[in-house]
Amino acid sequence: MYRFISSKSLKDVNKAYLARYKKKESFNKKFAEAVDECPEIAGLLPPGTKGIDLLTYDFSRLVDLYYDYNKTLNDLHDDARVKEINDKFKAIFNYDSHREKIRRFLSDPNNGFEIHNCVYCDLNKVKGYTRRDGERNLEFHADHVLDKGSCPLVALSIHNFVPSCPTCNEPPLKGVRPLGNTKADTLKISPKSATNKFDKDVKFILNITDTTIPDLELFKTNDGWEIDFSYKDGGYWQTVSMFELKERYNAEKTYFGEFLHRKKNLDIKEYIENSIYTEDEILELMFCYERNKLNHTPKEKCRLELLEQV
């Protein structure tokens, strides 16, 4: 997982996003009417809050709103009333009516978001491509970090979206579940959070499970070794568990094993003596460090961290 935050200022992103909504007055009127009809929710919002304001709440405010909204509805102990409230706000914050607009906004480089691989697993490229007619084909799902079904108020909030692959976005993996079970956890481990440190606090590790296999033969097959994780912050195990990253990365051992076998059996001095290339050039040819970095090749964090251990 990696952070997905615009390189633009929050002010610029918010302004550009709101410019895509042309019927703000009508939107705000419907929202005000719904709040009047749902006094249970009114207390969750600062006085004078307009419906359009929620579309640009920063992620920490969205987390507060999401958890407070769900607690308020759960405390009602009235399923019929909960459904009534949810239905009112779902009709206003209708994601299906704005789905393509949101995906186009996220994929527009002018808005400062970089989309290359699924932010949850980094196993699949979701960048898309340009069709022959010049139109951009978008291959990613705009996933709600905070579920729109259980809190419709966050359904259109631009700081609640990340690009994901279908596998991560749908059940039985993430589906409608939030990342983390508390406000603190969700703020810490979500890709929309500036405090997310998955890249530094979680490392892929190489476990040798069969020490009888000779070193130079170990990575010829997928037997005798596995990919696992180590944590500086144990909170991130929730991410690894939710997206079944251990199982999914081990399913890719053939890919990683080719590079591990190559490095394990590499005699760089012999290559240099019999080549016109420098050591750095040989390593680049064999392991594509710079090329993969430039191309944002999927699975690269795992590949590099495993190679460091061989």
Each language-model region and where it sits:
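N-terminal accessory alpha/beta regions
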Residues: 1-105
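C-terminal, charged low-complexity interaction regions
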Residues: 2-37, 77, 219-310
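Short, flexible, mixed-charge glycine/proline-rich loop motifs
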Residues: 102-114, 153-158
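Short cysteine-rich loop/turn motifs with clustered Cys
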Residues: 106-139, 165-167
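Histidine-centered nuclease catalytic patch
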Residues: 125-160, 174-178, 184-188, 192
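Domain-level detector of nuclease and nuclease-like folds
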Residues: 152, 171-237
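Aromatic- and glycine-enriched beta-alpha-beta binding-site module
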Residues: 160-171
